[in-house]
C-alpha cells in the first residue's frame, strides 16, 4: 500500500484493533511477515533492458550510473533491520493513538502510560557497507515521509503526520545544533517556517527547553521515528558527545519515540559508554553489517551474482568464481567499492573497444583507475586490527573531492 499524494490515504483492515483503530498506523505498510517479504521490500533494482547494450556509447556510459541506485539485501542483517525497525515504529505509535484517552494525554503534554518501552537501534559497519542505503530502504518501506489526514472512521482528523525525521550528525554537533537541524528540517517538510530560529535564539544549554521544543515537534506532527546518521561524527566532540547522547536518552524515555542510529564502529564505541543505551541496544536491535572475510561468503557471492546482471557492454559475460574472487580482492568485501569497480570496469571495456568484462578487466581497472582507493583496501588486506581501525578515515580521504 503506497499513497501517491499527501491527501491520498488508504486505511486498511489488518484484523488487529490496535492497528485498525489508530489513524497513525492504519495506513502504513505492515512490517514484513517473513524473511522473503523483507528481501523483496528492501531490494532496489536499476532500470535495465538487455537491448540497452545496443545503444550508442554515450548513452550506455550514462546508464552505467544506474548502479548507484542498486541495493540487494543479501545480508541477513538487512532483513532483520527492516523487520525490527518497522515493528518498533508500530510499537511506538500504538500507545500514542490520538483517538484514545492515553494518546490524547500524550498529545497535550500529559504523562502517558507508555507500557511499551521505547528503544534505540544501531546500524553499524565500515564505511561503504551500505548503512545509509539500508536506512533509505527501511524508511521507504514503511511508507511516505509525510501524510495529511482528513477523516478517520467518519471523524474529523485534520492532522499532518511526519513518519520520520532523519538528520546526519554534523562534525561539530551540540545539543543545540542537533535540535536546530531537526527544527529546520521539520519546516522544510511542512513547507512552513514554524521552528526556524527557535533554537539559535537560545543562549546557554537549557536542556529542558530543548526537550520541550523537540517534544512539540514530535507530538504536534505525530513523528514516528527519529533517525541519526553519521553518528560517529560525535567522536570529534569529546565531552560534548556525552551531552548529546544523554539528550537522546531523555528523548527516548520522556517522549516514548524509537530512535535509530547509524554509523561506523566508532559510533558503537560511543554508545557502549552509556550502560542505559547499551541495554536498550540489546532490546531495540544492533544490526552489524559485517564485512565478508572471504570471497566464499554466501552474502557476498549472492550480491555479486545479482549485480552482475546489469551489464551495459555490447558483449555479456557470465559470472564465475574467478570474477567473484577478483571482485573480492579489489574491494575486500566492501559493497560500495565492489560496485564502483564493477561500474568502472564496464566503462573501461567500452572505452578500449573490448566491450566485455572479465576478471582481468576488473583487476586492471582497479590498478589503473582507482589508485586513491588502494591505501584503504590495503588496510583491510593487512588483517591488522590496529590498521583496520583506520580504514573508515582512509576511505573517506580517498573519496574526498580534494583527493589527488
Residue ranges and their predicted role:
Residues 1-49, 65, 220, 293-404:
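C-terminal alpha-helical "lid" subdomain
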Residues 1-119:
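Walker A/P-loop-proximal flanking segment of P-loop NTPase domains
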Residues 101, 112-116, 158-159, 174-181, ...:
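Mid-core helix/loop region of P-loop NTP-binding domains shared across ATPases and GTPases
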Residues 123:
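Hydrophobic anchor at the beta1->P-loop junction of P-loop NTPases
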Residues 141-154, 188-191:
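Post-Walker A helix-loop "phosphate-sensing" segment adjacent to the P-loop in P-loop NTPases
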